[in-house]
Amino acid sequence: WMDVRLLYAFTTLFVIPICLLLNTNHSRTTAYRYFRHRQGFGRLRAAWSTYLNHCLFSQIVIDRFAVFAGKQFNIEIEGYESFEQLEAETKGFMIFSSHIGCYEVAGYSLISKTKRFNALVFGGEKATVTKGRQKVLVHNNIRMIPVLEDMSHLFLVNEALDNNEIVSMPADRVIGSAKSITHELLGAEVRFPAGPISVATLKEQDVLAVNVMKVSAKCYKVYVKRLSYDKQASRKEQMQQLTDSYVKELERKVRQYPLQWFNFYDFWT
């Protein structure tokens, strides 16, 4: 682990300060606003938290590639019984993730013995990232479904659910002009993608929220929470209830781990 910690130190002391000074992608600005206005921190605390936030992000990127290289982290799981309960049923189910912590480091540790795991990932990644991920996941019955512009990935998602498999997808970012659902998060309105909510309610799927948070240099903690909604209610009410449940869990984790918020853009509109 010394090599990883040396990388942590190098990025903390040299890389992050330069990135924050340049602020080329406005991550410093958006992170500061998040801490100042959404978390309610004072100016000095918000500025310091912005630095720590970027340091944590760099560490998680390092951890991600360390996993691809075969490194092992200690994994704690809270709420695993919810996953086991749904896995034991005949029907498949869905998992909603978010851009907090690092789902990829430990989220795929929720391995099913009976159902194939399908993970929706954004296309356009570098070949080294894709190759590294496939190397790690090839023996775990996990299929990666890249998000494509022609929307063909939706057919694979529907096929997987029709085959009673598990489908995992991020549920916090609206891409392009996609349909959205407006909901309050940390005291202000946010547009959440309607796609994951729509698919889940249309297919009458059970849904888990899974968030993976870094708790130390060697350890991540996986939080599994079953999201509730009334499948007998109208479709509109179902979508609202499921959104409420997802956002409530997201806000709980963001309050608990404020430094691990990694949506580096104007998330609140």
Please provide the spans of the model-predicted regions.
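Non-catalytic C-terminal accessory region of glycerolipid acyltransferases
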Residues: S112, H139-N140, M151-T269
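Catalytic core of membrane glycerolipid acyltransferases/transacylases, capturing the structured
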Residues: G42-R45, S49, N53, K91-E149, ...
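A conditional alpha-helix N-cap/helix-loop micro-motif detector
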Residues: I75-I77, I100, K126, V147-D150, ...
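Membrane-anchoring hydrophobic helices of lipid-metabolizing enzymes
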Residues: W1-S97, Q134, N141
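Conserved beta-strand termini and adjacent loop/short-helix elements that scaffold enzyme active sites
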Residues: E78-Y80, L120-F122, V147, K225-L227, ...
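Hydrophobic alpha-helical segments typical of transmembrane helices
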Residues: T30-A31, A106, G132-R133, G195, ...
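Active-site metal-coordination segments of metallo-dependent hydrolases
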Residues: T24-R33, E125-A127, E189-P193
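Short amphipathic alpha-helical segments and helix-helix/interface helices
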Residues: F83-E84, G107-Y108, R133-Q134, V157-N158, ...
